[in-house]
A protein has these predicted regions:
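Mg2+/Mn2+-dependent nuclease catalytic core
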Residues: 100-197
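Metal-dependent nuclease catalytic cores that hydrolyze phosphodiester bonds in DNA/RNA
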Residues: 1-113
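C-terminal end-of-chain micro-motif
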Residues: 1, 197-198
Length: 198
């Protein structure tokens, strides 16, 4: 990912990759991932920095390969891309968007931002999806994350998703896993965060 500036719903969203920092209308806002840390903050405690760094590098490579394939048809030797293509053929989903920037609002005030991995069309439904390359698929984490993105995407683009899916790719493992829609739980997580008073 690289630095970018987008205008969404009249708000200027800037992203600075080196710091992983989002700025909306000149004000720093946490990423959706940082909001998730309220509930899942110690998710990787006990995992060495080296392992985390290698996993991050691999995850970035997988995301980039899928983005390049979806946008330009660029092929790659990554097994995860082959598995993505298998899932796409098996489930007959169409990629409508990838790496879509969003702003999350509370009471019309920007409180967070992020980039959504995929918007899909599947069985004539619009689906928000996230690519996961973790050692184990954490459906609870993915559900909170995708519900926050669901709210933000609707606020930014006026489109409501009917399903949430995880495209899980880890080595030879592949899943197109559904996670539940629970916007109430997502809003409760925002309240639990405490940084966003009414």
């Amino acid at each position: 990912m690289s630095n970018y500036t987008e205008v969404i719903q009249g708000h200027t969203l800037e992203y600075f990759d080196d710091e992983h920092q989002y700025i909306v209308d000149g004000i720093c806002v946490p990423s959706i991932t940082q909001i998730l840390a309220v509930k899942f903050g110690h998710k990787y405690s006990g995992v060495s920095d080296k392992v985390l760094q290698n996993a991050a590098i691999r995850g970035t490579a997988v995301h980039k390969a899928i983005e390049d394939y979806c946008i330009n048809g660029t092929e790659s030797d990554l097994q995860e891309l082959r598995n993505f293509k298998f899932l796409q053929k098996q489930y007959e989903f169409e990629v409508l968007e990838n790496e879509t920037p969003v702003i999350l609002f509370k009471n019309n005030k920007p409180i967070s931002a992020g980039r959504l991995d995929l918007v899909l069309k599947y069985k004539n439904k619009i689906v928000g999806a996230d690519i996961k390359c973790t050692a184990k698929l954490d459906r609870e984490y993915a559900a909170y994350q995708l519900n926050l993105y669901k709210i933000a995407y609707r606020q930014c683009y006026g489109v409501d998703w009917q399903l949430l899916r995880v495209v899980y790719l880890k080595g030879d493992k592949r899943k197109f896993a559904q996670v539940p829609i629970n916007e109430t739980g997502a809003w409760e997580l925002i309240e639990e965060d405490g940084r966003f008073p009414d």
